[in-house]
């Protein structure tokens, strides 16, 4: 079942008297429950696209259909509801609240939606049950990233958007984070989109979208995604 349809999406930013093209004629479909990787070098337009899919920015051209609704035409209030109810975000930098414990950071996100998952249960799922009462400064980078994932997962998002989620992590911790994201797709049915410049991650995806110079360069589907345990990158 098609969950995301992007049709001729374009995004431009003014710079002086010129317009900078961030996305141009971007078109693709994503099926519900897929794990998708968007690849591209810095400046290719992939983070802009992720922000538009997440309702943090809006397209200037084209359509961005999420579950049949064109979010490019939503009001600011409607976009807020969309982000709250349907979307989870994971970034390279964890954005945890420093004076809240791991559990409290997860609870903070869970409070804004109905039927959220239990914070302790989600922290157990990401291997941090014994660290729930620690503050961010007491956690390693990998542990902080897993708290950030738990915070996103607790909302039970239909769409999980991840911008370079392993970029600041060591190899083993990065694989742990990728396993959690793959499980969200395989076991929870969430549609997971990972933006990265690391092409070595492509084999784990159901679909790989490559961007270059603000446009889609290629789209590939993978009938047999690789297990994280056997991934080398």
Where in this protein do the model-derived segments appear?
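ABC family nucleotide-binding domain
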Residues: 3-4, 9-211
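Conserved beta-strand-loop-alpha-helix hinge in the C-terminal portion
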Residues: 207, 215-233
């Amino acid at each position: 079942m098609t969950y995301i349809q992007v049709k001729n999406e374009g995004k431009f930013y003014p710079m002086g008297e010129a317009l900078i093209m961030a996305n141009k004629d971007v078109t693709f479909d994503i099926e519900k429950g897929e794990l998708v990787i968007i690849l591209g070098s810095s400046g290719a337009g992939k983070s802009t696209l992720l922000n538009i899919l997440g309702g943090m920015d809006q397209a200037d051209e084209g359509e961005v259909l999420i579950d049949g609704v064109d979010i490019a035409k939503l009001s600011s209030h409607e976009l807020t509801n969309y982000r709250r109810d349907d979307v989870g975000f994971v970034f390279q930098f964890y954005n945890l609240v420093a004076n809240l414990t791991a559990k409290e950071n997860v609870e903070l996100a869970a409070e804004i939606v109905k039927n959220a998952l239990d914070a302790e249960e989600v922290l157990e799922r990401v291997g941090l049950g014994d660290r729930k009462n620690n503050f961010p400064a007491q956690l390693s980078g990998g542990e902080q990233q897993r708290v950030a994932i738990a915070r996103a997962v607790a909302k039970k998002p239909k769409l999980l958007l991840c911008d370079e989620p392993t970029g600041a992590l060591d190899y083993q911790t990065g694989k742990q984070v990728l396993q959690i994201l793959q499980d969200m797709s395989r076991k929870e049915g969430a549609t997971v989109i990972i933006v990265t410049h690391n092409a070595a991650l492509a084999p784990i995806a159901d679909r790989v979208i490559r961007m270059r110079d603000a446009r889609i360069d290629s789209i590939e589907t993978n009938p047999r995604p690789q297990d994280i345990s056997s991934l080398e990158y």
